[in-house]
Amino acid sequence: MTDWLDILKQQTAAGDQMSKTVTDMLADPAITEDQVKTLFDALEQQAEFVEKLRVALEKFDHDFPVIRAAERLEERYGDLAAGVAEKLKALRS
């Protein structure tokens, strides 16, 4: 049986690390458009995975705080992707 709570914990830890990594990368003045695009694509994939995780948690009737934690993680990846998209837009200007 899949341990959805363990997966959520792992993904939350990965999200914490990703937040720091994204911030550091976007602050680097030498970052290239290709690097930003790759970063955006990775964040989009991660957001899609977390969305599927949230749906699974809902399907298996986990408590609201667990589902809410997955929603917050999904929002975090969305916010990170939006920040990266802004950087990509700025680099293309």
Regions from the language model: what does each represent?
Residues 36-44, 64-75:
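Short, charged, amphipathic alpha-helical segments
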Residues 66-93:
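Amphipathic alpha-helical binding modules
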Residues 3, 13, 38, 60, ...:
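Intrinsic disorder/low-complexity signature
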Residues 21-25, 52-56, 83, 87-90:
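Amphipathic, soluble alpha-helical interaction motifs
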Residues 7-18, 36-53:
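Short amphipathic alpha-helical heptad-repeat segments
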